[in-house]
């Protein structure tokens, strides 16, 4: 087994770009470990991390303002390569003696970039040749400020029509700045440029692979747990599923999984979870049927946030009750992943604005005196899926669309009732079945049905009936931060509507949600 597979590591300092997590994932895809820290992290932490290279992300601020973020000065004294992207390039230029100006003429979208001088970062990269016989790249720009004077010993490597210094470099120190975004797919040679920086200039060895991650994680789990007992809340989602299989591989029957059927799951989901994890993989599972308990707790509650809190509280109560029945349990396992920690600002890297309180991070029962095990906390979702494939989990489970923690509790608008959940489950299953038949399920990022607690008139035979309404939602997105409604074929939508109205008794109308994000969110509640 290869040890210390994260010994070659890239540190990314986050200045607030919407693409920063994507940047970290791009580096992981090369097989190199990367971490994402806030820009104002303490200098001692950076030194202790021992990065092989440092990347400064983009950001929404103007580098021309005096009170905007700056990189810790220590990064320019460590003797490691530094790559500044967009805002990261601008703050690098200012901090090293250059000038950045707001020209009131930004660049947004595609731009042809002409390579003026040879450099290790971009030599051999080319999308086309321009009329001046210069090799050019098609890049994605998103900036209003630009570097107008180079720091001492820097060279201009590339230009666009409105940005004379689009790439700058200090060849001896291996400091580089690019005004565009290499991490997005719109920059055609972006991944090649990042690979050049990480693998060649920083000389990182690609050891961060699914097989190596599994081997190292299993070894660490065995050392950490020994002969102790571990308890895990199994939801059937990707994160808890991979956590369960990893722990089962490491400690076998010392793992007890608690699976709570809250009555808010998708059609047949409870049985599918038991079939896979209990029958196929042989996990020790305590199955708690608690639909009535959840429905009683939700009675009369319409506010979405209150519903979320009630569902979370009841789950914790049930989990506590089951944990108390187990003898000798010393560890609580969770499927926390890296994005949970980043978004909850709970990784303790520096001051960071709290984006949201994630249920895995903020919802721990305070009275539980158990050690915490989070074997996936350094992994992004796509890495977790890769581990799942290596571990033998079904592809269909690993690539299911996201499902909210409160389940159908936030897809039934207003008060949650068993009747509403039953209707919604059937309608949702029909929608997903038809998407799969049309081979469109994996082409949309997320698709689901929503129950609207309003009665609409319909005609059934010779009579008029007032029955419920179902809304269908399908979106396309790269990062779930912004999304476009999926332009599904009309004939598909027609089939789905006809099936739901004919097969789900109590539904008389089906509508399709064509709202983007923003202004709408992906979920209705």
From Swiss-Prot:
Entry GO MF terms: ATP binding; GMP synthase activity
Catalyzed reactions per annotation: XMP + L-glutamine + ATP + H2O = GMP + L-glutamate + AMP + diphosphate + 2 H(+)
One Pfam family, short name: GATase
Function, as annotated: Catalyzes the synthesis of GMP from XMP.
Catalytic residues identified in the record: 86, 181, 183
Enzyme Commission number(s): 6.3.5.2
Pathway involvement of the protein, from the record: Purine metabolism; GMP biosynthesis; GMP from XMP (L-Gln route): step 1/1
Subunit and interaction comment: Homodimer.
Entry protein name: GMP synthase [glutamine-hydrolyzing]
PROSITE patterns tied to this protein: GATASE_TYPE_1, GMPS_ATP_PPASE
Superkingdom of this protein's organism: Bacteria
Domain GMPS ATP-PPase per the UniProt entry, residue ranges: 208-400
Organism: Hamiltonella defensa subsp. Acyrthosiphon pisum (strain 5AT)
InterPro entries: Class_I_gatase-like, GATASE, GMP_synth_C, GMP_synth_GATase, GMP_synthase, GMPS_ATP_PPase_dom, NAD/GMP_synthase, Rossmann-like_a/b/a_fold
Domain (Glutamine amidotransferase type-1): residue spans on this chain: 9-207
Any single Gene Ontology cellular-component annotation: cytosol
């Amino acid at each position: 087994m290869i040890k210390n597979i994260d010994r070659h590591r890239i540190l990314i300092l986050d200045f607030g770009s919407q693409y920063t997590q994507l940047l970290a994932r791009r580096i992981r895809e090369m097989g190199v470990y990367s971490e994402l820290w806030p820009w104002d992290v303490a200098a001692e932490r950076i030194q202790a991390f021992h990065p092989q290279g440092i990347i400064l992300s983009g950001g929404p601020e103007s580098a021309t303002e005096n009170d905007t973020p700056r990189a810790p000065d220590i990064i320019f004294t460590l003797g490691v390569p530094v790559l500044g992207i967009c805002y990261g390039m601008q703050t690098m230029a200012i901090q090293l003696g250059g000038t950045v100006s707001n020209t009131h003429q930004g660049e947004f979208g595609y731009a042809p970039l002409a390579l003026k001088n040879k450099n290790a970062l971009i030599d051999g990269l080319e999308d086309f040749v321009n009329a001046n016989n210069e090799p050019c790249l098609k890049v994605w720009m998103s900036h209003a400020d630009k570097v107008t004077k180079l720091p001492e010993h820097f060279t201009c490597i590339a230009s666009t029509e409105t940005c004379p210094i689009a790439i700058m470099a200090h060849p001896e120190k291996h400091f580089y700045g690019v005004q565009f975004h290499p991490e997005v797919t719109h920059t055609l040679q972006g991944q090649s440029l990042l690979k050049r920086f990480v693998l060649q200039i920083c000389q990182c060895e690609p050891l961060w692979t699914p097989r190596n991650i599994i081997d190292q994680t299993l070894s660490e789990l065995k050392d950490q747990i020994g002969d102790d007992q571990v308890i895990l809340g199994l939801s059937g989602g990707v994160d808890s599923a991979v956590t369960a299989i990893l722990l089962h591989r490491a400690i076998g029957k010392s793992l007890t999984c608690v699976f709570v059927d809250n009555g808010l799951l998708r059609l047949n989901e409870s049985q599918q979870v038991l079939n896979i994890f209990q029958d196929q993989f042989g996990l020790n599972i305590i199955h708690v049927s608690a639909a009535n308990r959840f429905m009683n707790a939700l009675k009369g509650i319409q506010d979405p946030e209150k519903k979320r809190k009630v569902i979370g509280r009841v789950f914790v109560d049930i989990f506590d009750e089951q944990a108390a029945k187990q003898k000798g349990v010393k560890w609580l396992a969770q499927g926390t992943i890296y994005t949970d920690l980043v978004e909850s600002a709970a990784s303790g890297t520096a001051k960071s604005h709290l984006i949201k309180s994630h249920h895995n991070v903020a919802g721990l029962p305070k009275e539980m005196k158990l050690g915490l095990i989070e074997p996936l906390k350094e992994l992004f979702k796509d890495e977790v899926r890769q581990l799942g494939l290596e571990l033998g989990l079904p592809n269909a489970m690993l690539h299911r669309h996201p499902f909210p923690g409160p389940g159908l509790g936030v897809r039934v608008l207003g008060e949650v009732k068993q009747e509403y959940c039953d209707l919604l489950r059937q309608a949702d299953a029909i929608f997903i079945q038809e998407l799969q038949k049309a081979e469109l399920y994996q082409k949309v990022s997320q698709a689901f049905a929503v129950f609207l607690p309003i009665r609409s008139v319909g005609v059934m035979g010779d009579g008029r009936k007032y029955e419920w309404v179902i809304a269908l939602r399908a979106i396309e997105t790269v990062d779930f931060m912004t999304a476009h409604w999926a332009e599904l074929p009309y004939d598909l939508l027609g089939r789905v509507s006809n099936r739901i109205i004919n097969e789900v008794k109590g539904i008389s109308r089906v509508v399709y949600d064509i709202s983007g994000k923003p202004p709408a969110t992906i979920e209705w509640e």
